[in-house]
From Swiss-Prot:
SUPFAM superfamilies: TNF receptor-like (SSF57586). InterPro entries: TACI_Cys-rich-dom, TNFR_13B. GO terms for biological process: adaptive immune response; B cell homeostasis; hematopoietic progenitor cell differentiation; negative regulation of B cell proliferation. Receptor for TNFSF13/APRIL and TNFSF13B/TALL1/BAFF/BLYS that binds both ligands with similar high affinity. Mediates calcineurin-dependent activation of NF-AT, as well as activation of NF-kappa-B and AP-1. Involved in the stimulation of B- and T-cell function and the regulation of humoral immunity. The chain crosses the membrane at residues 129-149. Its main location: membrane. This is Tumor necrosis factor receptor superfamily member 13B. The keyword Nucleus does not apply. PANTHER family: TUMOR NECROSIS FACTOR RECEPTOR SUPERFAMILY MEMBER 13B. It comes from Mus musculus. Disulfide bonds join C6-C19, C22-C34, C26-C38, C43-C58, C61-C72, C65-C76.
Length: 249
């Protein structure tokens, strides 16, 4: 006969080839089967204890009376109120001590972190000030650069604009050099006449002529003109080359 599945409170006996109750073997010291069941049976026999299947151990009901399971209901209900209230009262000072400790730790932490917060605010103020200074320096640099570029684009005041305009507007500005030379050569020549020259008595006289431009275009210079000498009745007469000489009287 094959081995059959037995319930939790029984085990399979190979000699009998049947399921046998574990209660018969729990009293034996050398029992190897039904260990969990035997622990459960023995825990139920003890008052104020219950068997926890998750832990696989016997747990006292005193530690779970506030949140006790159903197995400990009869024990926690019969428990004296003085003992039931004693544990919460003992626990309250501990909670108070924990609160005091937490408050003290919070104060200590606050005292420790207080200067850190102040230091961070000072650092923030310092960084803001430095940022404003850097912005001001950058703006000044941009203004200086703009003024430099503006001055660079303006013409240099080496030559005044007035003479340029007057030279450009003058009628002789665009005339070629040949025309100017023609004007110089075409200007009226000074006239010199010699009349009644008496070489044996006095030097010939020179009439005043208007000051005009010479050969080279300088004022006050007179171009010399050759005179032709003629004898009229024993008198020497000089004639100008221009043909404006007057005969002697």
């Amino acid at each position: 006969m094959a081995m059959a599945f037995c319930p939790k409170d029984q085990y399979w006996d190979s000699s009998r080839k049947s399921c046998v109750s574990c209660a018969l073997t729990c009293s034996q010291r050398s029992q190897r089967t039904c260990t969990d069941f035997c622990k459960f049976i023995n825990c139920r026999k003890e008052q104020g204890r219950y068997y926890d299947h998750l832990l696989g151990a016997c747990v006292s009901c005193d530690s779970t009376c506030t949140q006790h399971p159903q197995q400990c209901a009869h024990f926690c209900e019969k428990r004296p109120r003085s003992q039931a209230n004693l544990q919460p009262e003992l626990g309250r000072p501990q909670a108070g001590e924990v609160e005091v400790r937490s408050d003290n730790s919070g104060r200590h932490q606050g005292s420790e972190h207080g200067p850190g917060l102040r230091l961070s605010s000072d650092q923030l103020t310092l960084y803001c000030t430095l940022g404003v200074c850097l912005c001001a320096i950058f703006c000044c640099f941009l203004v200086a650069l703009a003024s430099f570029l503006r001055r660079r684009g303006e013409p240099l005041p080496s030559q005044p604009a007035g003479p340029r305009g007057s030279q450009a507007n003058s009628p002789h500005a665009h005339r070629p050099v040949t025309e100017a030379c023609d004007e110089v050569t075409a200007s009226p020549q000074p006239v010199e006449t010699c009349s009644f020259c008496f070489p044996e008595r006095s030097s010939p006289t020179q009439e005043s002529a208007p000051r005009s431009l010479g050969i080279h275009g300088f004022a006050g210079t007179a171009a010399p003109q050759p005179c032709m000498r003629a004898t009229v009745g024993g008198l020497g007469v000089l004639r100008a080359s221009t043909g404006d000489a007057r005969p002697a009287t």
